[in-house]
A protein has these predicted regions:
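Alpha-helical transmembrane segments of integral membrane proteins, especially early/N-terminal helices
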Residues: 6-22, 48, 78-89, 162-169
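Alpha-helical transmembrane segments
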Residues: 58-65, 130-134, 160, 202
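Membrane-interfacial interhelical loops
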Residues: 34-45, 94-117, 155, 159-199
Length: 202
């Protein structure tokens, strides 16, 4: 008896999943030499959240349509959702590993805050993005329409936050996808506030 259904085990070797894994890993490697973002902290977490948004949506839509149209899967919806949660988070394993190794050699600066930002921003973002992509996949009739709907929602959400920041520069922005941005003018040291915890918890 197989512990993992072929639908799931095959997906872990599929091209879409490997592309997303390599993209997030490559992004982390590109960011590492760059000052400010090349250490585990808010800036690195923010950029990884943006990358993870698209990556998670891409693999979620692909997997859901595999599930919908592969009639012999016999996988119920709950099993699909339970697989999606760790799957979404798995795309962040290599970026986190790379930045921890780099930060370990260069000397950790605010390690616990940086790790907390990584959990609160990209990790929570992947779960939110997976949920939205799942909904889009269930509502749309094909991958293209699901992808267009997903991108429209993401751009609409992020665009609204950017518009608010442009109109009111001193303001900060909370967003389900990129997480949090303290505004164009912010202190060098960004701390985790109860408001951020509540916003990401919701």
């Amino acid at each position: 008896m197989k512990l993992v259904h072929p639908l799931f085990s095959n997906f872990l070797h599929s091209k879409p999943y490997l592309i997303v894994i390599l993209t997030t890993a490559a992004t982390a490697l590109i960011l590492i030499p760059i000052p400010l973002v090349g250490d585990i902290g808010f800036e690195f977490a923010l950029l990884m959240a943006l990358i993870a948004t698209g990556g998670t949506g891409f693999i979620t839509i692909y997997l859901v349509f595999q599930w919908r149209f592969y009639q012999e899967t016999k996988v119920n919806f709950l099993s699909l959702v339970c697989f999606l949660l760790p799957l979404s988070l798995s795309i962040l394993i290599l970026p986190l590993t790379f930045i921890l190794v780099k930060s370990g050699f260069s000397g950790f600066c605010n390690f616990y805050d940086g790790l907390a930002f990584f959990v609160l921003l990209p990790c929570v973002t992947t779960l939110c993005s997976a949920a939205v992509a799942l909904l889009c996949s269930l509502l749309a009739h094909n991958k293209l329409r699901a992808t267009i709907l997903f991108i429209t929602i993401i751009l609409g959400s992020i665009g609204t936050s950017i518009y608010r920041l442009l109109i009111h520069p001193p303001l900060f922005a909370y967003n389900p996808f990129f997480g949090y941005f303290p505004g164009p003018i912010y202190d060098e040291i960004i701390v985790i506030t109860p408001t951020l915890l509540i916003a990401r918890g919701l």
